[in-house]
Amino acid sequence: MRVADFHFELPESLIARHPLAERRASRLLVLDGVTGDLQHRRFADLLDHLRPGDLMVFNNTRVIPARLFGWKASGGKLEILVERVLDDERVLAHVRASKSPKAGSRILIEGGGEAQMLARHDALFELRFDQRVLPLLERVGHMPLPPYIDRPDEAADRERYQTVYAARAGAVAAPTAGLHFDEALLAAIGEKDVATAFVTLHVGAGTFQPVRVERIEDHHMHREWLEVGQEVVDAVAACRARGGRVVAVGTTSVRSLESAARDGVLRPFSGDTDIFIYPGRPFHVVDALVTNFHLPESTLLMLVSAFAGYPETMAAYAAAVAQGYRFFSYGDAMFITRNPAPRAPEETP
């Protein structure tokens, strides 16, 4: 399959650069995976598409204010984007500067604090701070808005680029499908006898990296840490026993569940994943998906195409563009039921 098969034209005006005033005020494009039919709804209408006995699986990662500004002790400004917290004081980070810092060099942090560059690991720098990392980031860090939100972060982003159920700090990008849920909607979901469970996948900056090969099969995914606990495995088993559907909230929840069931059996899992889901790969756990609209030629669009079918997905995206849906992290959402016989690009007439 060619990466170019997943291209579509997107007007700049449809990229959402700010969230709506209310989380569930977004639009919802419903795609029936069996028939390919589309419905244009509001996100609050998601309740109409859930059934008693279903299980919704959320990603409870918490976005850290991972972007720091500073300068080398020897002179020269730089920008740090923390990719992964290794321990209380060490991180792996992207460093943008006119000249990369060398091992042993000191970095002064705007707002207070400093770090030492310990080693370079390919594109990432291992840094050690002079204090605990997470409190430092909370104090002087900036929310790591995606590159397509071309504005400085604002105070409101601390709340809105975060799900209301975020619990475990470590992500440098939000699991954006979850941004549409507020406390009232979550309560209404529970009142409908829809169960909930939580996985953790700390979304890395690699989620925004373009695919740099021509053929999908040649692409290697970035690694991200996740955890699927025994309670999630038990919740899925109980859902199956009562005839419910497993509804993944976001592609990160899909990748978590399917990583923990690579051999077809869902088991507890904690560790790194580099799972790459594209057309032709089977799904062992997920029956329905809540997701935002993704970038052209992105691995996340490929995942959605694997789930809903390539022609159905691209037709839905064309309809979304024509209807003026808002795209990407602060944009609108889709609710998709799994296509039992999804077609890949080569199979499309």
Swiss-Prot record:
Where in the cell is the protein located?
Cytoplasm
GO annotation terms (biological process) = queuosine biosynthetic process; tRNA wobble guanine modification
Q: Chief localization class?
A: cytoplasm
User: What GO cellular component term, any one, is given?
Assistant: cytoplasm
As given in the record, the signal peptide range reads none
E.C. number, please? 2.4.99.17
**The UniProt record lists the keyword Cytoplasm:** yes
What reaction gets catalysed by this protein? 7-aminomethyl-7-carbaguanosine(34) in tRNA + S-adenosyl-L-methionine = epoxyqueuosine(34) in tRNA + adenine + L-methionine + 2 H(+)
Q: What Pfam family is a match for this entry?
A: Queuosine_synth
What is the purpose of this protein? Transfers and isomerizes the ribose moiety from AdoMet to the 7-aminomethyl group of 7-deazaguanine (preQ1-tRNA) to give epoxyqueuosine (oQ-tRNA).
- What is the designated name of this protein? S-adenosylmethionine:tRNA ribosyltransferase-isomerase
The species this protein belongs to is Azotobacter vinelandii (strain DJ / ATCC BAA-1303)
Q: What is the lineage of its organism?
A: Bacteria, Pseudomonadati, Pseudomonadota, Gammaproteobacteria, Pseudomonadales
